[in-house]
From Swiss-Prot:
GO terms for biological process: isopentenyl diphosphate biosynthetic process, methylerythritol 4-phosphate pathway; terpenoid biosynthetic process. The gene is ispF. InterPro entries: MECDP_synthase, MECDP_synthase_CS, MECDP_synthase_sf. The record marks H35, T134 as: Transition state stabilizer. It comes from Halalkalibacterium halodurans (strain ATCC BAA-125 / DSM 18197 / FERM 7344 / JCM 9153 / C-125). Involved in the biosynthesis of isopentenyl diphosphate (IPP) and dimethylallyl diphosphate (DMAPP), two major building blocks of isoprenoid compounds. Catalyzes the conversion of 4-diphosphocytidyl-2-C-methyl-D-erythritol 2-phosphate (CDP-ME2P) to 2-C-methyl-D-erythritol 2,4-cyclodiphosphate (ME-CPP) with a corresponding release of cytidine 5-monophosphate (CMP). This is 2-C-methyl-D-erythritol 2,4-cyclodiphosphate synthase.
């Protein structure tokens, strides 16, 4: 049996925070605002995986109203989601991700993101694709107000 899930997330930029995307710290003047570390890409992958197994979304499992998850490491959240995936008997077929950001440039960091995501999903790097695009200065990402991300995941039993 195969299952497909889709994820999407958005976070706005904020002063005084680290920018962590795909489990990788990226040098930049701002970070992303969120209850956890606001890793927009790992949140997207978690949502896609939860959707594929019919377990809701990241907000259901790690609500921003719970102080336990304040400043949480999103890698730990994704690892917890992956345990649910494994409990249901699934492994990764592949995951395809897109980061939507005007700045900073993501290309230099994509190999490290792929490696970290593969590690978290107990998979080979060949099963993980990460790409980045801009919105050609249109919308909130184009104005440099934040970053969006989307992912599609294929799980196999």
């Amino acid at each position: 049996m195969i299952r497909v899930g889709q994820g999407f997330d958005v976070h706005q930029f904020a002063e005084g925070r680290l920018l962590i995307i795909g489990g990788v710290e990226i040098p930049y003047e701002k970070g992303l605002l969120g209850h956890s570390d606001a890793d927009v890409l790992l949140h997207t992958i978690a949502d896609a995986a939860l959707g594929a197994i019919g377990e809701g979304d990241i907000g259901k499992h790690f609500p921003d109203t719970d102080p336990h998850f304040k400043d949480a490491d999103s890698a730990k959240l994704l690892s917890a989601v992956w345990e649910l995936v494994k409990e249901k008997g699934y492994t990764l077929g592949n995951v395809d991700c897109t980061i939507i950001a005007q700045k900073p440039k993501m290309a230099p960091h994509i190999p490290a993101m792929r490696a970290r995501i593969a590690e978290l999903l107990e998979a080979e790097e060949a099963q993980v694709n990460v790409k980045a695009t801009t919105t050609e200065t249109l919308g909130f990402t184009g104005r440099g107000e934040g970053i969006a991300s989307q992912a599609v995941i294929l799980l196999v039993k």
